[in-house]
Amino acid sequence: MTASDLTVGPARRGVLASAVGAAGAAALAGWTAGAPHPAANDPGPDPRLAAAGATRPFRGARQAGIADSPQTYAAFVALDLAGAVDATVVRRLLTVLTDDIDRLMAGRGPLTDQEPELAGVPAALTLTVGIGPRVVAGGGAPAPAWLAPLPPFTVDRLEERWSGTDLLLQVCANSPTTVAHAQRRLLTGLAPLTTLRWVQRGFREPHEGPGLPMRNLFGQVDGTVQPDVHGLDEALLWCGGDQPAWLREGSALVLRRIRMNLDTWDQVDRLSRENAIGRRLDTGAPVTAPPGADALAPPDLDAQDSLGFHVIDDGAHLRRAHAQAPHERFLRRPYSYDDPPAPGELSDSGLLFAAFMADPVRQFVPVQQRLAEKDLLNIWTTPVGSAVFAILPGAREGEILGEALLA
């Protein structure tokens, strides 16, 4: 996480003040009367307080929660608009959302928030808004060709309850309390206009640095190969001049709910797991990489063993997911989920595969087709949910989200 990702808002002062008050005389014991400096054994400010008060900017050309460092907790919230949808309804919806998001990301509660103390712990909160075809049509704008359900893949066992909707809210923060509070406040504000379709909650390992991969519940290092979205590969993430004008500086989100059969995965030895993945489990390095290599080491897809077989199996996940053209890359921002199991089952766990890109049909579909054809991990994984959303451009000062959509 870079310094530019985070700033410490006014909420930190309140947190610090509370901490000092609670410490009372015990805190003063480390000081001599009138001494200008703390005692030698004073550990200094608690870094957890700074993390709790950390904020990320809302205003700008692009929305937060995409190219910035993933937080530890997430909720993907899908809603349908109630009744007919026209430009008036869309403007009202986006006006309410813009005001509430602006306040919450700054560590302030919305106007109707009766628990503003919870909003005062933003914990790097980001709130990202995506829309479906019905909202685009209601705004009177043309939709991009890719804003539609993905084509069917042979491995899919999709459940209607996890399908696409009119509106998506991605709520991410480094505190589960912050995520829960922000989610509730947004839903309360939208209650007259929307009905809730589904909520998918996820988590991932906390990391200090930006762009670091996570481990999913298979123990697999996930999200290792990412485009340079802050440099040469920006066009792979952000919509440009070949897209509808209202979507420029926006993006596309593909959200796939992938159920992982941990019960049968437990029966697989580590060597077989590494063969299926194409990477070493301990470091995430390709199985062709030399000792000491990390997850960013390039794979040797041509390497063969003494019998003439590929070292990286023809069905290994790494090989099937590997880009075969420069445009077959996208920004992965996945989260794991672990929900209560159904009766008779030991687990209901998996991956919320969230990927951002400029054009899902051109970038994502070819990769997913190769995975569906022959990925060895298909033995233990089943896609049960799939949705595509247009991620709105950001809102500059004085604008609402989706301003250009309604122009």
Regions found by a protein language model. Give the residues of each.
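Long, histidine/aromatic-enriched segments associated with O2/redox biology
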Residues: G14-A407
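N-terminal secretory signal peptides
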Residues: M1-P10
